[in-house]
Amino acid sequence: MSEDIQVIVVDDNSPDADTYLERYPELSRPYLEFIRASKNGGAGYARNIGLDHAKGKWLLFADADDFFVGNMYDIINTHVESDADVIYFRKQAVYSDDINRKSPRSGYIDKIMDIYLKTGDELPLRTRYGVPWGKMIKKSLVENHHIRFEEIKYSNDILFSVHVGCLAKKIEAIDTVLYVVASREGSATSNYCLKPDELRIRAGAAFRYDSFLFQHNMSQRREIVSYIRRMLSQDRSLLNYYFKRLDEIYPSKIAALKDICNGCSLKFKVVFYLYSLIIWISRCLVS
């Protein structure tokens, strides 16, 4: 590894971190900085610690179990003098138990990369590449705009990513794979939004994301929609809370209802419209 690369590994206060240096001698390499967090604050907390210790011109992120392609250094070295604030790359997705098997994970990234490379439309790339990995981010962009990860249990990176994308003066997209994301088969859908507080936390992050884009006239699709649909069957009180706030991310309640029900079954539409009517009537009676 070249000496002009700084690698920061942040341990989220795991109980066996004290033995890491003994078990993994490579952590003592001069370019590598091993940091043990004072608490287990989740990925957003750990990433912010990494930001505080970063010294270089560019930032690249990697999640546990994922990895960069073998010629990663050659790729980033080619673009290190770019005047762009963010450089987006293609990713490859594989299964962790067999990296020769391709996974459909994060397929939406392939689609928005295709859109940009074919049409030059920057908006999907700036607003919907919602993960920190797979891109080179100029550190000055993050510092000048005080961009940080949300220190929440789920979806900590969505607001960071949209801030980076939308506040960048210039972006580039390179038709080259830089990063490989690995996942266990079935892990993405097995119990999504069924853990305690998961729906509330993810919906909150999605709403803040939608609100940012709405305020900047950059809305294309609302991330909150899929969570509101879940709320109808999982958490009516949470649905009531966000129903009252739909005007903050839509031009009107009617536009919101049409968007939420778009593509849904007739049964869902009937139940959702009736429930929405009940909420509206109850609000009128209270006022």
Regions found by a protein language model. Name each.
Residues 1-36:
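Acidic donor-binding segment of Leloir-type glycosyltransferases
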Residues 4, 15, 31-32, 239-287:
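Membrane-interface aromatic/basic loop that binds lipid-linked glycans or pyrophosphate carriers
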Residues 11-14, 41, 64:
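Conserved short acidic donor-positioning loop in nucleotide-sugar-dependent glycosyltransferases
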Residues 37, 62-64, 174:
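Catalytic metal- and UDP-sugar-binding loop of GT-A-like glycosyltransferases, i.e.
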Residues 37-54:
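Glycine-rich, basic loop-to-helix element that forms the pyrophosphate-binding segment
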Residues 43-48, 64-172, 182-197:
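Donor-binding/catalytic cores of nucleotide-activated saccharide
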Residues 59:
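Short aromatic/hydrophobic "clamp" motif used to bind/position activated sugar donors
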Residues 177-185, 191-221, 238-255:
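Catalytic core of nucleotide-sugar-dependent glycosyltransferases
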